Amino acid sequence: TGVPDLPVPEQILSYLETYRRLLEGVCISGGEPLLEPGLADLCGAIRNLGLEVKVDTNGSLPGALEVLVRRGVVNYVAVDIKGPPGKISALTGARLPEEALVLAVEKTVNLLRKAGIPHELRTTVVPGLIEPEDLLLMAQWLQDGSRFVLQQFRPDRTLDPSLRQVRPHPPEVLRQLARDLSGFFSECSVRGAG
């Protein structure tokens, strides 16, 4: 076509430059976006356009998140908590030992709290994988000062074919779970449950 291929960050920034007057911010999600070595530079360039930056992470890379925090290029972070200590590796298939994953999540959450970065901790409540007692363990583990969001499981949006037949909890069950956990967090809410 005669048009050179641009690196992905340049394409992103060009698009954002074109539409920035219509946008308030950008959410960088994944996979795990903190695995990308150029993420801090991309976030900085987005901030230089006058846009807010939200990053979604699983909490396993606190060192990479610390770079974003130190450079002041992230406005909000959502940490996907996959399960309570003792179940994270099994639920995610991660190659890291369970203890390393637990420590990484703790470091991530503590970094956000200490730096005063607005954030939320969130868990997708998959029946059969995340039970009410798991949520209580997670609340006891991560309590104090964060927003905790229970996300409704959507079987039509899962990558795992074995979960497509799982029936999500009724919305009232999730709302009751949020009420039960509300004493552990500054706020506990439900997302995607109607």
Feature map (PLM): residue ranges:
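N-terminal [4Fe-4S]-dependent radical SAM core
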Residues: 1-3, 18-22, 189, 193-194
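Canonical Radical SAM [4Fe-4S] cluster-binding loop centered on the CxxxCxxC motif
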Residues: 1-11
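A C-terminal junction/extension of Radical SAM enzymes
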Residues: 173-194
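Conserved AdoMet/S-adenosylmethionine-binding subsite of the radical SAM
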Residues: 13-25, 34-171, 177
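Short, charge-patterned binding micro-sites
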Residues: 30-31
